[in-house]
Every structure is written in C-alpha cells, then in structure tokens.
Design a protein with these regions (language model features):
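A short acidic-Thr-Gly-centered motif at the start of a beta-strand
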Residues: 5-10, 52-58, 213-221, 292-297
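Alpha-helical coiled-coil heptad-repeat oligomerization segments
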Residues: 38-39, 78-85, 89, 153, ...
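Reverse-transcriptase-like RNA-dependent polymerase core
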Residues: 1-13, 31, 40, 55-56, ...
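Metal/cofactor- and membrane transport-associated sequence elements
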Residues: 1-92
C-alpha cells in the first residue's frame, strides 16, 4: 500500500497516526476508545477486556464493545442519555435504540424474557450448502458416530467444508444443542473426508427442522450458579483422547457451555471425568469473578453435578492415589475450590446428566429431553418467522 514520489523515489513517509486498514488500526482504535471511557468513570473489567463497568452510588452502567459495535445498558434513562451524549461528542456514532441485533444475533424482548436467535443465519447456512429442500432429521449426530481421520475417501471440496464448518461454529453461540456434532466435524477441517462431509450434512438436515429455535433468558429470582459436567472415555478412534463437556446455569438460565476434546489421554474413566470437573470449575471461577466485578457477588457455593462416583470422591477426599498422582495439578485445583467453599461437587444419575448431550450422540427421546433443558425454545408468537 502506498505511492512513489516522483522527486523522492527512494524515500518513505513516516506514519504519524494509524490509518484504517493497517494491521495496527484495531489496536489503536481500542486504546483510543478505552482511554476515553476511563475518563468518564468507567473501569475496565479484568475478566473481559471488552467490558467496561460504571458504578457510582445508585448509578450503574455496563458497556460492551466488539470492534466498533457497542452495547450499553444502564440503571436509568438519565444515565444512558448522559453517557450517550459524552460518547457522541467524542466519536461519530449512531444510536440504534433498544438492542435488537448484535453480531448476527437477533434479540427480542417480551416482558421479562429475552429471546436470542440466529435463525436467519441458520437458513443462510442451509442455502450455502445447497440443501434448501433436504429432509430434516431429529438429531444432529447419530448414536454410533465416531469420526476418524481415515474415514473414507478425500472430500473433493475442502474449501466448502471449512466454510460451512466455521459457520456452524458461529451458530453454536445460540445453539448449544449442536456443539458436540460441530466439534466433531471441525476436528477434521484440515483434511476432510467424505464421511466427515456426510456428518456435516446431517447437522444441516437437523437445522432444516429446527432453525427457528433460539436461546431464552428469563428474569430469575435465583442467583445461584449450577453446572453439569460429563466426559466420554477414549472416544477419539485416532488419538484415544476423551471428550468433555459442560453447561452452566445462572439461576434458571443457561449462560455457558462447552464440548472439547481433552488434550491428554486419560488412563481411566474417572480421570477423564475428573478432568471435565476441573474444566467446569475453572469456568465457574471466571464467572464468579465476573459477577464480583459487576457488583453482584455470590455468597453460596456453586454446585457441580457429575455422574462418576470416583471423580466426586477425588474432589473432596485429600488422599494420594497411585492411579491419579499424575493428574495432581487438576486435583489440587478442584480440591482447593471445594475447601474454600466456592464449589461443591455432587452426584447426579446418568439418566439426568444434561451434559451427556455435549459428549456423545444420543437417541432421539433422550436428546430432545436434554435439549429442552438447555433454554432452547421456539420464538415468541409476535416474532415467529423473523
């Protein structure tokens, strides 16, 4: 990028400030914005650098920024107008009114409920795959699906595969029910096979019948943190690594979920489950710290439900075991949180282990039962079809 000066063909210009399009521009904009909002009395969150918190007496405001898209929520309209005036005086910006659309996510408010959906984005994925007339299926992955890197012949359009797999990853922001299936196909993005493509098409066929579903957030009287965690054991046919998954509820609302292949091989099912417990406890620590910054501290221990008795025993019993001494770091981390009263690890029967949906393919009845527990609903009547 640039031009050649006729009189000084061997000279270069010194850049005095960042220009739009340069790789340094996003960082420069972020620093410029941060410096200004700090002068308004905001504090930058240590848990999330894109979150700014304003708390003075009875006035509270939260500001979330992603590049140049901003969400601002305040405790009063007076405070909102004051902050908007200050921001508009410093930066060229437009007030789009109440939150209705952010980063591809449609937001609808009805009474005391928020409905978050990416239904239009889901339909776009179906169209990009050329599957607008496909027949829907009841589940995104079959019960026997264990994809291998050697599954059949090479797929002839890896670019399309990667594009759709990446799009499905973004869709999991409001669709926790597909995260396990998406995680399984994304593992093979580097060298997709025909079987991997068939697995991806099954996810799209599932979306064909469920694209209307979205995430609901209700006003809740409870401020308790509750989590479910589960893991398969040596589920990957190539690496023999396990897949762990969890979901976290704040009151009655689902706020966090994950499905990931573990980074090491577990020597027992208890070890695989315990590593899953450590993962969700780490997430709970982050959420508790975030709530503390938001001036909403929790006073009660967060509950973690696990269906493996041995993993529960390890979390609270300070005994050294020959078979678990190699996972000492995770053991000490979880035990420390338990001893501090921050976390309690309790047993749940496997039939009611919601996190199963994040670690394996399930039969239709069980899948739909667990899906109904993930805050996924049809849109309110006034927004159906949007």
């Amino acid at each position: 990028m640039g031009f050649r000066h006729r009189e000084y063909p061997d000279h270069v210009c010194r850049l005095r400030k960042s220009l739009y399009g340069l790789k340094q521009a996003p960082r420069a904009w972020y620093q410029r914005f941060t410096d200004f909002v700090l002068t308004l009395g905001f504090c930058q969150s240590r848990c999330d650098n894109s979150l700014f918190i304003y708390h003075h007496g009875a006035d509270t405001a939260y500001l979330l920024i992603y590049v140049d898209d901003i969400i601002l929520t305040t405790s009063s309209d007076r405070l909102r107008q004051s902050l908007m005036g200050s921001l508009s005086g410093e930066f060229a910006m437009k007030d789009l009114g109440p939150l209705s659309y952010f980063l591809g996510i449609s937001v609808t408010r009805t009474g005391d409920q928020l409905f978050l959906t990416q239904s239009a984005y889901a339909r776009d994925i179906i169209e990009r795959a050329g599957m607008l007339t496909c027949n829907p299926v009841a589940t995104p992955v079959d019960t026997n699906s264990k994809l291998s890197m050697d599954s059949g012949a090479d797929f002839d359009n890896p670019t399309l595969f990667r594009s759709l797999a990446g799009a499905l990853q973004y869709l999991t922001f409001t669709r926790p029910d597909i995260i396990y299936a998406v995680q399984q196909v994304c593992i093979h993005m580097h060298a997709p096979k025909v079987d991997h493509w068939n697995a991806l098409k099954r996810i799209i066929r599932y979306l064909q019948g469920t694209s209307h579903l979205g995430l609901t957030i209700d006003r809740s009287t409870s401020s308790a943190l509750l989590a479910y965690t589960d893991a398969d054991w040596v589920g990957c046919p190539d690496t023999r690594r396990s897949t762990s998954g969890y979901c976290v509820y704040f009151g009655s609302n689902l706020i966090s979920w994950s499905s990931k292949r573990q980074t090491t091989i577990s020597r027992s099912s208890a070890e695989a489950e315990y590593r899953g417990v450590a993962n969700v406890v780490a997430e709970l620590c982050w959420i508790r710290n975030l709530l503390l910054e938001l001036h909403r501290p929790l006073t009660r221990a967060s509950i973690v439900y696990c269906d493996n008795i041995s993993a529960i025993y390890l979390s609270g019993n300070p005994v050294q075991h020959q078979r678990t001494k190699h996972i000492e770091l995770d053991i000490h981390f979880v035990r420390e949180q338990v001893q501090r009263g921050m976390v309690r690890v309790l047993h749940v029967p496997s039939r009611f282990q919601i996190a199963d949906i994040f670690t394996k393919g399930l039969p239709r009845v069980l899948f739909e039962d667990f899906r109904s527990s993930l805050s996924l609903r049809s849109p309110p009547a006034s927004t159906a079809g949007v």
